[in-house]
Amino acid sequence: MAAIKVHGSPLSTNTLRVLATVYEKELDHEFVLVDMSIGEHKKEHFLSTHNPFGQVPAFEDGDLKLFESRAITRYIACEYADKGTQLIYQDSKKMAITSVWMEVEGQQYEQIAAKLAWELVYKPLLLGMSADKAIVEENEPKLAKVLDIYESRLAQSKYLGGDCFTLADLHHLPTLHYLFGTQVKKLFDSRPHVSAWIADITARPAWLKALALQSQE
């Protein structure tokens, strides 16, 4: 039995973020499907055992139990630094720059992208509801401004953190995947350095393995 367990749903952006990290590190693990359609993540057993906030993913590595996807990915990258892809830098200055862009993803990009993904993907597909046009119209120009900054950064560097693929890039993958099936795709395509970066990171075998789990859902 694998010491590492990932509890979640492959439809969840946060679960995909952790799974992509596990695959990049080529770690033996067990994926435990959480049936969110019946609210399994809100039931007492899950709340008391895995995540008191009733969200996915939850993560186990032996006796260690974690939740919050970015905390999990950072742990994996540090604990298994000698395995698979090196997702963090050992050099403190390079890692500081990578950490800046990890924060940018969580605090600038994701705050906007998640709202758009909810309106344009999750509401229509999962809830049968129409997108709130006002929210979409408010957030599209906000995302465009963030992507202008990304375009400038990626004109100087192949990846956000530097010359190597790191967590700063990986963390973007799940929301990018969903937004690329919407009208928002044009904002990424119109910026050549951003577009090239996305083509690179979305073609990674580890990411494709994580996405393949959706076909089993």
Give residue ranges: language-model regions.
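GST-like domain detector, emphasizing the conserved glutathione-binding G-site
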Residues: 1-137, 141
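Positions that flank functional sites
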Residues: 36-37, 165, 216
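Active-site-flanking alpha-helical
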Residues: 77, 175-176, 211
